[in-house]
Curated annotation (Swiss-Prot):
Cited NCBIfam families: rplN_bact
Organism: Xanthomonas campestris pv. campestris (strain ATCC 33913 / DSM 3586 / NCPPB 528 / LMG 568 / P 25)
Entry-linked Pfam families: Ribosomal_L14
UniProt cross-references to InterPro entries, sorted A to Z: Ribosomal_uL14, Ribosomal_uL14_bac-type, Ribosomal_uL14_CS, Ribosomal_uL14_sf
Name this polypeptide is given: Large ribosomal subunit protein uL14
Domain of life, source organism: Bacteria
SMART domains tied to this protein: Ribosomal_L14 (SM01374)
A Gene Ontology molecular function term of the record: large ribosomal subunit rRNA binding
């Protein structure tokens, strides 16, 4: 459950290490983002010579949350931290590698690239 001012780890090699959610996209009254939702983020910590710089604003898709996701069979997939993957203007990932597991809920048409790059799909 990600809301404004939430800090997330970055699960790709775009150069950002930590981002902060500044808006949950999808309507003016939308408060929380879950796995698979697109949020607007600002880069709070980045490595030198990376593709992104501190202070820049990007779209990102949430790939892991502490809250987790409930499956139709009743099981709950939950993670140790919140993580996101940065997206460009065409909603494609900026990085070329994904770190850590992602969930099957990302298997929509929009995020198949992220699922194919991920080392593990839960």
């Amino acid at each position: 459950m990600i809301q404004m001012q939430s800090y997330l780890d970055v699960a790709d090699n775009s150069g950002a290490k930590e981002v902060m959610c500044i808006k949950v996209l999808g309507g003016s009254k939308r408060r929380y983002a879950h796995i698979g939702d697109i949020i607007k983020v600002t880069v709070k910590d980045a490595i030198p010579r990376g593709k992104v710089k501190k202070g820049e604003v990007y779209d990102a898709v949430v790939v892991r949350t502490r809250k987790g996701v409930r499956r139709p069979d009743g099981s709950l997939i939950r993670f140790d931290g919140n993580a996101a993957v940065l997206l460009n203007n065409k909603q494609e990932p900026i990085g070329t590698r994904i770190f850590g597991p992602v969930t099957r809920e990302l298997r929509s048409e929009k995020f198949m690239k992220i699922v194919s790059l991920a080392p593990e799909v839960l």
